[in-house]
């Protein structure tokens, strides 16, 4: 299963609160970033790309948190 599908599954999960969905996306981001540590430069670039997708999904659920995460990713 690819990252986009995992993000979609978490965002569209039935019977979950906003907090549960944001937590699920942040856990996915943690897993993606763990793959990037000690990895070649290409893997680190890819993990940052995935983080951006995850944070954009978070911003659709919780605008304030998503904006904060995106701002810090770029900074």
Where are each of the predicted segments found?
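Alpha-helical propensity feature that highlights long, continuous alpha-helices across diverse contexts
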Residues: 1-75
